[in-house]
Amino acid sequence: MTHLLDPTAGTGPTRDGLDAWRDLPAAQQPSWPDQQALREVVQTLAEVPPLVQPHECDLLRERLARVARGESFLLMGGDCAETFDANTTEGIRGKVRTLLQMAVVLTYGASVPVVKVGRMAGQYAKPRSADLEAATGLPSYRGDAVNELDGDRTPDPKRLVRAYANSAATLNFMRAMATDGSADLSSVHEWNTEFVRSSPLGHRYEELATSIERALAFMRACGLDIAEMPATHGVELYASHEALLLEYERALTRYDRTGGAAYALSGHLVWVGERTRDLGGAHIDLVSRVANPIGVKLGPGTTPETALALAEKLDPDRVPGRLTVISRMGAGRVREVLPEIVRHVERERGPGSVIWCCDPMHGNTHETANGYKTRHFDDVMDEVRGFFEVHASLGTHPGGVHVELTGDEVTECLGGAQQLTAEDLVGRYETACDPRLNNGQSLELAFLVAEMLQAARVNR
């Protein structure tokens, strides 16, 4: 379908209640000191071209519908908080390359397609637990879209325009990598083979890597030119971020003139975080009114009743692929809390009415004795195992994983095959907010999840 956009959606009379959120509690919004500057920026953003197109969002929803039916697996990954300074060619290439490497391993393990969604091209805002930092008395850093990590941290609405521009540049580069041969299956597999050769625990993953190599060799022996096959030469790659800054999201919302639906065209998929998912709040109201695929994060304090109410609010028509529920329980709580949530939602809404996805990062954060916020790889993997165990016990589909990662060999998360310790963190601790898995740890996670997917397939 050809979609025609209404360019006046951000400035003209509102339809379908797109501004109803303005009368609701809006958590985690910056205290913009210059309201006139904010109004001017919002006007500018309402007039610029959208970052993505409705038909792309619709296609992602179709792909996610297969995930909901158990026919695909969802991989979401990228920075905790993107920064303007790190938005470089090599930085973007590294994250995309890592996602592609993980996806190849997961595809083979699951024997189903992997839907690849970057936590990229818009993740420039972060919720914080307090407006001021206790240690410095400065305003909290709320992401590059709001204020600078260095300096006096005064929220500056002009940074929203920079966030838009950086997101556009990232999307442009992601689209190029998806089709220029960078995603060629043989090349990605060779990167993974190098990881297996160099990893201290590479012998554990050698069998899976060898099996993939044999499959590729079989295809070549059959006369199939992998480099010329669209399915193995290019990929579909989508962008997602937390819909946190409401003025930004509203300004980039457009109406599809063809069908009349509103789309949040700041990204293909947007989600509402644990701190802003109040059922009667502004964030849930706004995303409930757009046609994109959307997500909602659920922490360990979520009740089954709340989870169901959120699902009914965000996806009342039960559109396949519409809603992804991203659990972030923590390794110590996932086996206790998640089963009743899944059981209640599936019973009341029917099987496959939502996608169940695991964020094993946010519930496993702690501070080391030397003052670094970190996560241990063992805790991350334990939450993923718990997630799979819950779904195996209920007969439901473990639909995906949502991981904070980078393509660089940073030292931010403990453990893994590299056996990083607290003393190692000082080496390359580069995150602007929360700790990320490095390239090696990300691939290790992918190999381990692939083993879980294989086991789930055998036991199905």
Language-model segments: which ranges?
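Generic low-polarity alpha-helical segments
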Residues: V287, G352-V354, C358, R460
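Long, contiguous, compositionally biased segments that the model treats as domain-scale units
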Residues: M1-A145
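Non-transmembrane, aqueous-exposed alpha-helical and coiled segments at domain scale
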Residues: P316, R322-I326, A331-W356, H362-T411
